[in-house]
């Protein structure tokens, strides 16, 4: 079944480039940039990938991102991810990157973007993988800081298709970023947002009504609100669900409790994604395979999930 799932043409719509930084590449970049790491070797670092919640993961994620310093580093990071896409027949990807993670460390915005954009361009030309880049604001920072990031992005507007919202969800509702999202839409960007991962269904309502999103990233807690479920089904608002991430961060205690197939059967346009695959133990095919082994996902369900991902692209072929 793994090989069959791997061969299925699919799109990935919820992937943080910084979260695809495998320990081996992290150590190689640390050496290249002469950065001392708090871990002795790759295995010690991998053992640190045990999280009880979103915040514990984010603390490690930001520490790991510190090895990314030059455009070449960002190119290598993105290229390594694209090679995984090629292996798993991901024919289109819409990855996030978090500029504030890097600009707050003194890395110029264009250094980050140039490396990522060059790799995505090469990915299309050399690997046949199409893409659309999403600039994500960090929700634990202020809206004023998000505005500043949008200002930095505008000279490079052709490099992005959308803005998003990620990082620590609790206590940082989508409404906190309504003005900057209004402005981004006015500037011609599409919008997406993480909501309903650890946060309540109310955050999903806010993302839909205030941020006017095209897609909800995660959204698994929508099932707690029947009226919200009906709205998502009626309007066919896609959900970019990340099963391995959800179990690794204890959103669900184990995969057998995951609600993605329940949502699929109720008519929700759910998709399967890897989120931060280096940290959560699997890329897209591994996420599909986990649904097969733990939930008994059928081939028909897998085909529908893969088709949903292709249908929910912001960048249409």
UniProtKB/Swiss-Prot annotation:
It comes from the Bacteria. It holds the Pfam family A_deaminase. One of its GO terms (molecular function) is adenine deaminase activity. Coiled coil: none annotated. It catalyses: adenine + H2O + H(+) = hypoxanthine + NH4(+). Belongs to the metallo-dependent hydrolases superfamily. Adenosine and AMP deaminases family. Adenine deaminase type 2 subfamily. Catalyzes the hydrolytic deamination of adenine to hypoxanthine. Plays an important role in the purine salvage pathway and in nitrogen catabolism. This is Adenine deaminase. The lineage of its organism: Bacteria, Pseudomonadati, Pseudomonadota, Gammaproteobacteria, Pseudomonadales.
